Amino acid sequence: MAVGKNKRLTKGGKKGAKKKVVDPFSKKDWYDVKAPAMFNIRNIGKTLVTRTQGTKIASDGLKGRVFEVSLADLQNDEVAFRKFKLITEDVQGKNCLTNFHGMDLTRDKMCSMVKKWQTMIEAHVDVKTTDGYLLRLFCVGFTKKRNNQIRKTSYAQHQQVRQIRKKMMEIMTREVQTNDLKEVVNKLIPDSIGKDIEKACQSIYPLHDVFVRKVKMLKKPKFELGKLMELHGEGSSSGKATGDETGAKVERADGYEPPVQESV
């Protein structure tokens, strides 16, 4: 028999011994996700993040997280085909304060609108809001039969399609350019822009199912906490605090000296 180590008596026990399993969730915390004040339901859910450890701060891991929420959950409504994207911009305590980051229609709604025997008209435009957000809006609309029409198809001529597309771009630009982001989101919730386009294009060719189908956020201005707090309905309290910090100048007569205190 070859002379060597007795492997069974080696130090440290078995080589393949199992390590003690640590539950990764024991190092994580739950944070509440808060939607801006323009929505009816503010508390939209919870999110997990690893606790602050050394240089790795928990709030940094939360900032920039994007949550996609159905409008039905935000407005406590039955109409559920619009999805809003909300991005975490700041963390206060256990609350993640979010801001608008985009909008989309659900796939099933989009597929249910596309049919035969009609023309689909699409347009997109890049617009800047008054408070410096650059948005790209996509619009979609479909031609419909006139009231007294017998023919099965309702196809628009190319010239009419171009006119409708031009009208779509004009209305989207006008509605966004003259408002700030909060007002734009308030218009996207009931989709008043789509209804305006439908009305304006009736004279060119009757349309139905006109929607702003998507909104992308292209550029944002520099982050300001005050503006985010305003969106969350806490602007007045935070505004006062910042205003009072500067202090007020006290009027004093020339050569004024404070009185000498007898005891300190």
Swiss-Prot record:
Signal peptide positions on this chain: none
Keywords: Acetylation, ADP-ribosylation, Cytoplasm, Differentiation, Isopeptide bond, Nucleus, Phosphoprotein, Ribonucleoprotein, Ribosomal protein, Ubl conjugation
Protein name from the UniProt record: Small ribosomal subunit protein eS1
Major place of residence: cytoplasm
SMART domains listed in its UniProt record: Ribosomal_S3Ae
Basic and acidic residues compositional bias, start-end: 242-255
Location of region: Disordered: 232-264
PTM: ADP-ribosylated at Tyr-155 by PARP1 in presence of HPF1.
Free-text function comment from the UniProt entry: Component of the small ribosomal subunit. The ribosome is a large ribonucleoprotein complex responsible for the synthesis of proteins in the cell. Part of the small subunit (SSU) processome, first precursor of the small eukaryotic ribosomal subunit. During the assembly of the SSU processome in the nucleolus, many ribosome biogenesis factors, an RNA chaperone and ribosomal proteins associate with the nascent pre-rRNA and work in concert to generate RNA folding, modifications, rearrangements and cleavage as well as targeted degradation of pre-ribosomal RNA by the RNA exosome.
An example Gene Ontology biological process: translation
Residues bearing the modification ADP-ribosyltyrosine: Y155
Species for this entry: Homo sapiens (Human)
Residues found modified as Phosphoserine: S236, S237, S263
Gene name of the record: RPS3A
